[in-house]
Amino acid sequence: MCTLFIADLHLSEHEPAITAGFLRFLREDAIQADSLYILGDLFDYWIGDDDNNPLHREIASALKTVQQQGVSCYFIHGNRDFLLGSRFAKESGIILLPQEKVLELYGKRVLILHGDTLCTDDEGYQRYRKRVHTPWIQRLFLLLPLSIRQKIAVKMRANSQSVNRRKSEAIMDVNQQAVIDTFERYQADWMIHGHTHRPFVHEVPLHDKTVYRGVLGAWHHQGSMFKITDKSIDLISFPF
């Protein structure tokens, strides 16, 4: 058996091929795993569990089917779907996790997270993140009519794309000291995250040993997952 990790699918009604690829992944790959961990940005945006549109219902149903077949499904919020809540979790059968979680897998300590908290050089984004994770701001936003929330989400998405085009590639990647500090805080052997869309396995020298940082790819033109067994940890890309 195995444990699977994915992130950054950015599912939306505008990308039906990605949705179809994810549904196929659930039917063919996830169903054979012990557990599936979704490390954020499953959806391109999330404006509340009451946005019960056909895509959300389809994904919830597919995840529920996997869970009913005995595969535990876990979710860590990303920067696009941090408002995903308990109602969707109940409908889909997923288990919501904190933003950082250590797993004991096959004799290794594996830290999982979305990854945006490691990008500390992007000070503008970190200020934004702090604001939108403020509980009273979230509560106020969720009280707005759904149509208003949809308009705000579209405007914020367009603004984010415009701002990111003006940022350097380096500033949007992880800060190495933040990575080291996080490894030390959790005493992990491996770290797996998404967010940066730069799939790779990095060796990180740490005191008298080497630890590993695995980065998941985004599901733009192909799927990306980490597969962990008792014998190996593999970063795998696959066609939709």
From Swiss-Prot:
Q: What Gene3D superfamilies would the database entry show?
A: 3.60.21.10
Q: Where does substrate bind?
A: 79-80, 122, 160, 164, 167, 195
Keywords of this protein's UniProt record, alphabetized?
Cell inner membrane, Cell membrane, Hydrolase, Lipid A biosynthesis, Lipid biosynthesis, Lipid metabolism, Manganese, Membrane, Metal-binding
Query: Main localisation, per the record?
Result: membrane
- Places the protein is found: Cell inner membrane
Tell me its cofactors.
Mn(2+)
Q: Which GO terms describe its biological process?
A: lipid A biosynthetic process
What EC class is this?
A: hydrolase
Q: Which GO terms describe its cellular component?
A: cytoplasm; extrinsic component of plasma membrane
Function summary? Hydrolyzes the pyrophosphate bond of UDP-2,3-diacylglucosamine to yield 2,3-diacylglucosamine 1-phosphate (lipid X) and UMP by catalyzing the attack of water at the alpha-P atom. Involved in the biosynthesis of lipid A, a phosphorylated glycolipid that anchors the lipopolysaccharide to the outer membrane of the cell.
What's the family? Belongs to the LpxH family.
| Full protein name | UDP-2,3-diacylglucosamine hydrolase
* Species this chain originates from: Photorhabdus laumondii subsp. laumondii (strain DSM 15139 / CIP 105565 / TT01) (Photorhabdus luminescens subsp. laumondii)
